[in-house]
């Protein structure tokens, strides 16, 4: 890494957080601009909120190690680079177009191992036709990752639709050597209790919110502290 990288890292007060960004910047060969973006979008806190207590502690020691489907998830995803505003009356197609127009930034936000495969991937059953918004492949997990974009609040029907997409890919697209398909619903708003009741515990389908602006760091830190306390952790662990 360059001296500019280390100047950026020196500004991070929390030792665990600084260690995480140093490991990731070196491993992923982030440029200074990439490092700045990941820090300013609070990647550390967002990854921590998507993991159990043990893996939160490992983030500062090993960085973001990808071994399971949950390791590639964030909640929320930060999509400030698309240039849309919450008040703007945009459609799912608008969001999809902006994501693909800024594919390099989107891949950075998605994280390790992702490659783009297709948009609006169509498949049919007799006379019924369906389309998956965005299809990616994760080479570390060796599986397809499907993204469905939802404007507004997530509905239980959306989860059922994604289950069908995942089932299709598992049965007709993936090979025997590949791992089960992951489905991610990106939505403005969601009811976590509804999602938990709708999906089985071993489901490979996830719902994550997206934000069109950089999140508030203190809000994420407070949320992480509260979650760690519920898990039996302590505030000084972050």
Descriptions of predicted regions:
Residues 1-238:
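Basic, low-complexity intrinsically disordered segments
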């Amino acid at each position: 890494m360059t001296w500019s990288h280390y100047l950026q890292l020196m500004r991070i007060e929390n030792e665990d957080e600084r260690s995480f960004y140093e490991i990731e910047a070196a491993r992923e060969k982030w440029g200074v601009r990439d490092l700045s973006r990941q820090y300013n979008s609070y990647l550390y806190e967002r990854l921590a909120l998507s993991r159990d207590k043990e893996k939160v502690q490992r983030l500062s020691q090993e960085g973001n190690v990808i071994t399971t489907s949950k390791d590639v998830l964030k909640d929320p995803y930060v999509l400030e680079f698309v240039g849309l505003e919450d008040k703007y009356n945009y459609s799912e197609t608008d969001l999809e177009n902006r994501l693909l127009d800024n594919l390099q930034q989107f891949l950075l936000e998605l994280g390790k191992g992702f490659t783009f495969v297709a948009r609006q991937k169509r498949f049919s059953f007799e006379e019924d036709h369906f389309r998956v918004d965005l299809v990616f492949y994760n080479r570390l997990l060796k599986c397809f990752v499907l993204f469905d974009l939802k404007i507004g609040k997530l509905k239980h029907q959306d989860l059922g639709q994604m289950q069908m997409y995942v089932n299709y890919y598992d049965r007709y697209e993936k090979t025997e050597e590949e791992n089960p398909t992951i489905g991610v619903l990106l939505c403005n708003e969601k009811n976590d209790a509804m999602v938990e009741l709708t999906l089985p515990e071993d489901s490979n389908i996830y719902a994550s919110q997206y934000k069109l602006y950089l999140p508030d760091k203190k809000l994420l830190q407070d949320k992480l502290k509260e979650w760690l306390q519920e898990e039996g952790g302590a505030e000084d662990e972050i």
